[in-house]
Structures are given as structure tokens and as C-alpha cells.
Amino acid sequence: MAALTMQFEGEKKNVSEVADVTLKQEDEQQERRSYSTPFREERDTFGPIQVPSDKLWGAQTQRSLQNFEIGGDRERMPEPIVRAFGVLKKCAAKVNMEYGLDPMIGEAIMEAAQEVAEGKLNDHFPLVVWQTGSGTQSNMNANEVIANRAAEILGHKRGEKIVHPNDHVNRSQSSNDTFPTVMHIAAATEITSRLIPSLKNLHSSLESKSFEFKDIVKIGRTHTQDATPLTLGQEFGGYATQVEYGLNRVACTLPRIYQLAQGGTAVGTGLNTKKGFDVKIAAAVAEETNLPFVTAENKFEALAAHDACVETSGSLNTIATSLMKIANDIRFLGSGPRCGLGELSLPENEPGSSIMPGKVNPTQCEALTMVCAQVMGNHVAVTIGGSNGHFELNVFKPVIASALLHSIRLIADASASFEKNCVRGIEANRERISKLLHESLMLVTSLNPKIGYDNAAAVAKRAHKEGCTLKHAAMKLGVLTSEEFDTLVVPEKMIGPSD
């Protein structure tokens, strides 16, 4: 035991030494980077701070970079949020010029903000999601970048504050109303331009398959066991309707997403704004985006709660539930090719195994179901975030925005990929479908009206026990003649109500 303890202590010491060396190397690399990068001095209320000269951000962004080193670049604030800030700040400058903002400064802000909206300045937005829950640092990131870029447009240097990030770019605004506003702008833009078109294409493709397969009668399955027949078209019609309803659900959330918090400022009262500012800026955003944004009916709700985002995420969660069911059904129906159900042939897109030659897997279905799992997880995060709106301000805004936008993008992209690389190329294996149909014992259900449930059950059990056909079992039990059986058991007549 003593020897083991000494060995463990020695190993622990070695690990500690390696860690110390690694940290020292990282510090040295950071120091070299510091010396090799030219800096300029920026100031905020905390005093001066060094900022890389090639970056447009200012003091508050730099402090956030130093204070929230969480997750690295992959955890950056989503690009749709950054672009939405560009839209909002451009519109704010436009409206503020009506209320006395120097037109020269206002026009420069609008030009700089347009560059942000177009994604031209993305490299100047380094902050991660994991920051203050109001998104203040990201709002200031936008203010500082736009202020410095506007100063350059006017022929001045970065950091001179000829255009001030607070007094000019953030005029009549608070992080508490700008961040929820860009959350809604980003979500609405992504839903209308990306998600809805993808889901519409998937719905159309599934509906097309439903029509293509409308005459193929197959055995149904409930509880994963044989059931009564239906057509493959009816089965795919169910999938198409699920997607259609999903589209309707997400569309029904948009009226709340179109309501903007801008003009509520710090706690919803509109302090430091002029009367009419909220209505005018919503109208300006609507004109800029060509989407029907309006000012929020109640600014206190718009700042303190994000029920609209939770509702939208809920619709995405429902869509994910539908898509997981659809993808699972399709891959199970395509299982095989020789030892599974094999009713469908799925497109063969790439080799499926590094050890089994010739194996091809339902990869699009697998990718889609993983996306659905992620979206369901995102909805949990959005739900928890939405429930933490204490008093006058929800302080989970960045994680709500990030998770919601992540879900929108994932469902949009995965739906498009699934439609293009799977659904569009699905083929029905008619021979296999027919074989399984006529082997099923559940065709016995059509005998119920003639011989009764108990006799029909006896026929099914006899056929299963002896491995014979239903017809043979019925005749052996003496409940039906051959002609009567052939008249009653017609799968094509079992796919709807009788006359």
C-alpha cells in the first residue's frame, strides 16, 4: 500500500509538472502575441485599456474579452444577432436624426451600421454568449465598432470618439431594450428566410411521395406489430401533414416575435427617449427588413420576459418531435437490404462502414434525428432561461437567443438535407411490400363482420400456430368456404371505410 501511495504521489507530481510547463508555454505565447500586436489606448468609465489597433471595438468589448474567456471562438454570439444589431443601430440613427442627432454623425453611423448588417465587420465581434445576462457587452461591442467605423468614415481615427458609442450610437437606447429587440429581429429573419422555405420544400416532397405511392397497399404496424393494411401513400400523407402542421405552428408564433422591445430602455418606462420613438423605430426596422415589425404592446413584458422566444422554441421542439418520428419510420422501413423490413429503398449517398464492404447506412435519417435531439435540448435551455426573468429584466437573454437561433438553423439545414438527399430519392420495393402484406395475420380483421371477433381470433391463432395461411385455417375450422374467404379478404378494400 505504501508503495502504491508513493507511485500515485509521483504520478501526480509528474502531471502537475506537465500542467505547469503547459501553462508557462501558453503565458509565453500570449506574451509574444502581446508584443507583436500594435495597440491603441481606449477609455471607458473604468479608465484606459489597451485594444488591438487593427480592431474596431473599444474598451468595454476588450474588458469583456478578458473577463469572459469561456468556450473559445465556437461560443461567439451568433452572426444573426450581430447582423440584427447592424439593422437596429442603422434604424436608431435614422430616427434619432429626426430628434436632433447631428445629420453628419447620423449618416456616418447609418453607413457603418449597414456594413455590420451585411456581415462585413464580423471579425470585430469577438464576444461569446457567456457574458452578462442582459447582453450589455454585445450591445456595447456593436456601439463601439459602429462608432469607430463611423469616425473613420468621417476621416478621424479610431478611439477619438468623434462619434461616441453611448451618446451617439446608443442614443435613446439601453442594452435592456436593444438586446431583446435584436433577438426578435434575428429570429424572425432566420425563420422567414431560412426555416420556412426549408420546411415547405420538405412538405412538398413528402406530399409528392404520398401521391406517387397512393396505390401501393402495404401492411400497417401498431406497437411495432402487424396491423391492418393501408397504402404507402397514406403513410407518407401522415408525414406530410405533420410537417404542414409544424409550419403552421411556427408561423403562428411570429406575431409575438414581430413585437419589438425598443423604446422601453432600462425597465420598460421609456426613460431618455422622446415620445413616438418606439413606434418610429419599429416602423424603420420593418421597412429595412421587409418584415411586419411593430412596437411591443407592453414594454415591461418585452424586457422582463421572453415568452415569445419560449413559444417559438416550443414550436421548434414540436417540429423536432415530428421529424424524429418521420426519420425513424423511414429508416426502419428501409432496413435491410435483405434481413430487415425492406419496404423502402433509400438513396445510397456514401459508404457506410470501414470494416463491412458494401454496407450503406441511412445517414440522412441519422443526422436528422441527432439534430432533433439537439433541438429538444436547446428547448430545455430556452425554457429555463425564459423562466428566469426576475422583476423588470430577464438576464438569460444571450443563451435564449443562442439556443433559439441554433435550433432554427439546425432544423432548416437538416430539413433541406433530408429532403434533397433522402426523401426525394425514396423508392418503394413493391414485391417486398406485397409479400409482407399477404403474409400478415392481421388481414383476419376483415372477417370480423362475418364470423365475429372470437372466431376471427381463432383463425389467426390457428394459422400462426400451424404456419399456414389464414384461408387454410378458416377452412379447417369450418367457419368459411374458400369463396367466402376470397370475397372478404381483399387488402385493397381494407384501406378505408366501407360503403
UniProtKB/Swiss-Prot annotation:
GO terms for biological process: cold acclimation; fumarate metabolic process; malate metabolic process; nitrate assimilation; protein tetramerization; regulation of photosynthesis; tricarboxylic acid cycle. Substrate binds at residues 134-136, 164-167, 174-176, 222, 354, 359-361. The active site is at 223 (proton donor/acceptor), 353. Coiled coil: none annotated. One of its GO terms (molecular function) is fumarate hydratase activity. Homotetramer. Its EC number is 4.2.1.2. Cytosolic fumarate hydratase that catalyzes the reversible stereospecific interconversion of fumarate to L-malate. Catalyzes the dehydration of L-malate to fumarate in the cytosol: required for the massive fumarate accumulation during the day in plants grown under high nitrogen. Also required for acclimation of photosynthesis to cold: acts by mediating accumulation of fumarate at low temperature, leading to reduce accumulation of phosphorylated sugars. HAMAP family: FumaraseC. It is found in: Cytoplasm, Cytosol. Disruption phenotype: Decreased fumarate levels, while malate levels increase. Leaves display lower levels of many amino acids during the day, but higher levels at night, consistent with a link between fumarate and amino acid metabolism. Plants are unable to acclimate photosynthesis in response to cold. Gene3D superfamilies: Fumarase/aspartase (C-terminal domain), Fumarase/aspartase (Central domain), Fumarase/aspartase (N-terminal domain). Belongs to the class-II fumarase/aspartase family. Fumarase subfamily. This is Fumarate hydratase 2. The gene is FUM2. Residues 23-45 have a biased composition (Basic and acidic residues). Keywords: Cytoplasm, Lyase, Transit peptide. It catalyses: (S)-malate = fumarate + H2O. One of its GO terms (cellular component) is cytosol. Pfam families: FumaraseC_C (PF10415), Lyase_1 (PF00206). PROSITE patterns: FUMARATE_LYASES. The lineage of its organism: Eukaryota, Viridiplantae, Streptophyta, Embryophyta, Tracheophyta. It comes from the Eukaryota. Residues 19-51 are annotated as: Disordered.
